[in-house]
Amino acid sequence: MPMEALHACTRVVYLGPQSTIVTARSMDWASDMGTNLWAFPRGMKRDGAAGAKSIRWTSKYGSVVAAGFDAGTADGMNEKGLVANLLYLTESEYVKPTPNDKRKPLSVSAWTQYVLDNYATVAEAVKDLRKEPFYVVPTMTPDGKPGQLHLSISDATGDSAIFEYVGGKLNIHHSREFQVMTNSPVYDQQIALNNYWEQIGGTTMLPGTNRAADRFVRASFYINAIPKTSNINEAIAAVFSVIRNASVPLGITTPGQPNISSTLWRSVSDHKNKRYFFESTRSPNVFWVNLSDMDFAEGKPTKKLTLTNGAVFAGNTAAQFKPAEPFKFLAAEVK
């Protein structure tokens, strides 16, 4: 079975009027990731969890994130409205460092958090990351899957960038037009496939399988077909409908692919109002976190909202986060 069928995710960005920018993603995985939400303050001392030479930094911005296995940041938004989404990419081929490589190693489990900690906008992140202060080091996930991933970021202006390691080199795709990302193939090929379907037209026919290329086409059509509105509640509802359309139903099986992964959860980020919405596919409610209600001041404790063990939330959950020791990023070994 192709790995992209096992770990299928989708990300979309809605570009509405009057700075109504909304980013959504689905998390599809073959096993329960034990996802919890975390709130990190400014001023946290970090290291890249990739050995003694790992890159080190201090967080400039507070953030609310969704952690996979409480071992890595999969998704999140920082207090400046920058959103980062980590998705699977089977074709990832990471850097093979040279003996005198000046870049510092960074575990793939900390890649998303590095971006949220350090940048306020996509343009700022792209400018700095083109210099490659680090290289990403893969590691196996706690459930034994290869950590082959690519990263999308979006900001309050509607700007987007995609970061992929292909053939041992970092590729960056930077444009407001890059509203959609799924999994395989690599991003330039995803764009080419979508261009073909745009010529056919989404009102004529859309591909309907749960393959990454088909989800890319459907998401691209619908995110631009839904009404453009400055009513943020209408916009969020519409974006939820798009990301649900690209999701994989719970327990679905496909002939020849009996273990295809279902969608575990979805997040929707309201960049303008700094709200992070979360929907577990096993919960009856959508809830959210108003980042403006979180105290991200340096020296404040890390906080956690525990979602495991059947917890159910509704409304703004900012006050329900509890102080907790921060999780440790899954360590990677430089080879």
Placement of each model-derived feature along the sequence:
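Catalytic cofactor-binding cores of redox enzymes
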Residues: 131-167
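C-terminus-biased signal that marks the final domain/tail of proteins
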Residues: 7-22, 137-139, 146-147, 156, ...
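A short, structured loop/turn motif at beta-sheet edges
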Residues: 78-80, 116-124, 229-235, 271-273
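Short, surface-exposed beta-strand-loop junctions and turns on beta-sheet-rich folds
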Residues: 29-31, 90-92, 168-170, 282-286
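C-terminal segment of classical bacterial N-terminal signal peptides
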Residues: 1-7
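Structural recognition of the beta-strand scaffold that forms the well-ordered cores
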Residues: 22-24, 83-86, 152-154, 162, ...
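Compact, glycine/acidic-enriched structural inserts
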Residues: 38-56, 93-134, 300-311
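A contiguous strand-loop segment
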Residues: 8-103, 136, 315, 319-320
